[in-house]
Amino acid sequence: MKKIKNFIVKEAVDLGSFFYKNTKYKTNENPVKVNLGCGLQCLPGWINIDGSLTALFGSKKFSFINKLLYKLAGSSEYYSFETYNKVIQKDGLKFYNLIKGVPVKSDSADVIYCSHFLEHLNRNDGRFFLEECFRALKKGGLLRIAVPDLDFAFAMYERGEVEAMLGLFFYTSDDYSFTAHKHNYNFTYLKSILENLGFISVVKLSYQHGECPGIDYLDVYPDHSMYVECKK
């Protein structure tokens, strides 16, 4: 049954990727703020984009579809159905497979926020994703990234907290391959990648602190995360 569910989810997302491949989202809001890999952390006035089954098939009209998605997409492990359905009803969630790029026009975004998505990409896909963020941002635009902090993992290991460290930072799953952590970063490593891509003013910040708007709501991982901001 689990293999069948995995197959359905993968094929559906792949099909969605094909039909949405040329999509470019836009907004009349100013400044233009983009929330990538957002899950259900959607904010009004932002372009909220996710590559999930929920973003692809969530329905404003038919709640029975959302109930099916709620279980199939695994959201029942993290959210109540009321919370899940409320996000869909607001129509604030857009679909795009972010492995394929960032679906906004070049030099169009003032702010890009991305929390706990980058670690789910392998090394090459992660670099391409960051290249796409650079392309999408206006000159002077701000990128804020949250990822598990690999230095925190090293500290856990040195304290003998090996099992907890493996679960947090080297997470794998039998349910859906995308939920696995495929690449990890500390600040020195991520800073070097960002600077090589052309980003400037790369700084490490703390939970809910920084220039990025909306982080009092968007930042949801206070304990083991690294928050980095940089500019184009």
Question: Could you tell me what each predicted segment is?
Answer:
Residues Y25, N85, P103-V104, L194:
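Structural motif
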Residues N30-G101:
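Class I SAM-dependent methyltransferase SAM/SAH-binding core
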Residues V34, I49, S115, I145-P148:
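Active-site flanking residues adjacent to catalytic metal/cofactor-binding acidic residues
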Residues A73, Y96, G101, N122-K231:
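S-adenosyl-L-methionine-dependent methyltransferase catalytic module, highlighting the catalytic core
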Residues I88, D107, L197-I200:
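Structured loop/turn residues at beta-strand edges in well-structured enzyme cores
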Residues Y96-I112:
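A short acidic, Gly/Pro-enriched loop at the edge of an enzyme's catalytic core
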